[in-house]
Every structure is written in C-alpha cells, then in structure tokens.
Curated annotation (Swiss-Prot):
Keywords: Ribonucleoprotein, Ribosomal protein. Part of the 30S ribosomal subunit. InterPro entries: Ribosomal_uS10, Ribosomal_uS10_dom, Ribosomal_uS10_dom_sf. Involved in the binding of tRNA to the ribosomes. GO terms for cellular component: ribonucleoprotein complex; ribosome. This is Small ribosomal subunit protein uS10. Belongs to the universal ribosomal protein uS10 family. It comes from Ehrlichia ruminantium (strain Gardel). SMART domains: Ribosomal_S10. GO terms for molecular function: structural constituent of ribosome; tRNA binding. Pfam families: Ribosomal_S10.
C-alpha cells in the first residue's frame, strides 16, 4: 500500500495567549499520539493595534481614551503527515476564540 505524505502548516491566531497556548499544546499532543513528527510551536511577534478616540464628543482634545487589541500568533509544522494524522486533527475540538488556518503542501509518494 502506498502512503501519501504531506507537509502541513497549522497557523493559530487568538486575542488570548492562554487559549492559544492551550490549543497549540492539544494539537501537538494529538499529532504526537498519531505518530507525527512536530516542529513548533513557533512564536510570531505579537501584533498590537491601538485606537485613540476623544472622550468628549465636541471639545477638549487633551482628554482621550486609548484602546488596543493584541493578536497572538503561533505556527505548528508537521513535515510528514499521513491520512491518520489528518483524521486525528480533524476530530480535535478547539476553543471558539482561536482562529485556525491549515495549509497542506505536497502529496509525494513514499
């Protein structure tokens, strides 16, 4: 039987770093239980978007409010993933605050 191996990149984004790390840990444990070799999690720089608005509606320019959104990002790489690993990852339940993007590369036989 010929097994098709693929390279998989799993990119995780979240506003809460605790949720993100917990999700990355569960993905890594699931992949290792299925027999995959795992690279990561690779930490990306935190992105901070700042919004500054006036407190008053008309005057008093010196009185302002600052808000920020911090976006945390991680990357997990599975260099040689087969169908059993993909099925195990598909059945994984992740929290609602985590954005998951999966990129599958290749399909070399062997």
């Amino acid at each position: 039987m010929v097994m098709v191996t693929q390279k998989i990149y799993i990119e995780l984004k979240a506003f809460d770093s605790y949720l993100l790390d917990r999700s990355a840990r569960s993905i890594i444990l699931t992949a290792k239980r299925s027999g995959a070799r795992v690279n990561g999690p690779i930490f990306f720089p935190r992105r901070v978007a700042k919004f500054i608005v006036n407190r008053s509606t008309h005057v008093d320019k010196k009185s302002r409010e600052q808000f920020e959104i911090r976006t945390h990002k991680r990357l997990i790489s599975l260099p040689k993933a087969n169908s059993t690993i993909i099925q195990a990852l598909m059945s994984l339940q992740l929290p609602a605050g985590v954005d998951v993007k999966v990129k599958v590369i290749g399909g070399s036989n062997g």
